[in-house]
């Protein structure tokens, strides 16, 4: 489910189709990805198959399931709405709340308050996303206007694996680099034909940076196509894209008069 669904809850209960209610335990929760992993005591629960969000097609049919406006309590069944995938890879970056929404699935399936944390499934009934938020067009509007967003299931699987293992998501990292801004004085001294980017001062032995072939004197211009002009810019790219240890990044560098 979503982190914002269970945030600040004193007690969490899960009601299955048919009305059976169970108390849930929080295995782990992560505000950055807005995901939480819950556990029910028992066995032989019905469950949905998790699909893949790797090769989704715009125009593909999808179904959003959930509990909009607490309607589940009337019939003890989830509500369903049908639509298509309107867009993929929708990036919102880091919000003021601290959440980072990357590669979101946009759908015109009706998603309303109460749908958060519910599944977005494909025509085969496989879960391809976690319904998370809607765009209403104004602060006063409350209902769906056909623009909803879901966290891709592949991203959710990755977070859930960490939550199951440790109860949290580890975002500690080390680049193995010491850098400084390329100022006009540095560019003149080193004969660099510009005064932008950051220059590598030191590369830690055995680090991923060393393994990738980076060297002192290289000038990093972009990280994942985003300009970097001061040391903190590298950290900002990592945080804004929710990158973690083991993730790969693409750099544009200047070395010995050539761009690489």
Residue ranges and their predicted role:
Residues 9-10, 45, 65-82, 91-117, ...:
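Active-site loop architecture of trypsin-fold serine endopeptidases
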Residues 7-8, 29-33, 87-94, 182-185:
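Short, conserved beta-turn/loop elements at beta-strand boundaries and strand-helix junctions
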Residues 16, 21, 80, 122, ...:
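Short, acidic, Ser/Thr-enriched surface-loop or helix-capping motifs
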Residues 84-98, 245-257:
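Short peripheral tails and domain-boundary helices/loops at the edges of structured domains
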Residues 3, 25, 52, 57, ...:
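C-terminal recognition in membrane/secretory proteostasis and scaffolding
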Residues 16-18, 28-30, 40-42, 66, ...:
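Flexible glycine-/small-residue-rich
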Residues 1-72, 157, 222, 228-229, ...:
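Conserved active-site neighborhood of the chymotrypsin/trypsin-like protease fold
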Residues 12, 22-24, 83, 118, ...:
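Small-residue-enriched segments and motifs
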